[in-house]
Amino acid sequence: MGQQRAGNRVSELHGCLYVVGGFDDNSLSSVERYDPQSNKWDHVAALTTPRGGEGIETVMGKIFAVGGHNGNAYLNTVEAFDPVLNR
């Protein structure tokens, strides 16, 4: 991983691992993808809202981040990442 983080979540999609959000000293919006075939990490599109401790699930080819905490308040929002569109 390129960024140290805790309280993040991980989901698998198309054979890659996606590490989503979390905290360093602040809540994070960054998302990193690990490809075990090439043993390489890449940054992909960031979350709109920084969050850690979120629920995460892969459904119908997209990764959904649900709730979590942004460092100031608990969140009741949902974001979806589409790897084909990288957003």
Predicted feature residues:
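Kelch-like beta-propeller repeat domains
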Residues: 1-87
